[in-house]
Amino acid sequence: MVAALAKWCTDTDTRLTFFVNGVNTSWTDNAPALAPMVESGQVQLGNHTWSHPDITRIGLDAVADQIRRNGDFLRTTYGVDGTPYFRPPYGRHTADTDRVAADLGYTMVTLWSADIGDDRGINEAQLVANAQQTFQPQQIVLAHANLPPITHCLSQLSDIINSRGLRTVTLADVFS
């Protein structure tokens, strides 16, 4: 999935932010394709923990380890650590987990305002219908790089973006 999304970004000049779990080997396997886009700023990487646990159900030391380990992975693999952006798995976080993240440099807990639902095993038609509803101005749209349907309708997603006069941006484009 990461390979297809990287190719889409290359082919269409799409700008976006990926929140990475380093345990998924696709991020290592596709680093040669993604690294130039990360270096140029076309693609931004944020920290999404090493292995995607519900951080509200593990101890704070384990939360720190998850964030630190993933930051180390990002730094070693891509030359960036994802700071200041952290997206807690499942969107679940507490004031304590936010403090742990902030202590490690991740001061921007980043959630989303719209979700295309691609992580729930929907088919391509449902995904495109969801994109029709959620691709609106000034939205942070949640999508995933782990199930095939999204890779089969990237051109349709581009068409929705372009037909509405929207443009994709990274978080740094907006908040820097």
Placement of each model-derived feature along the sequence:
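Active-site beta->alpha N-cap acidic-glycine motif
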Residues: 1-54, 60-62, 66, 71-76, ...
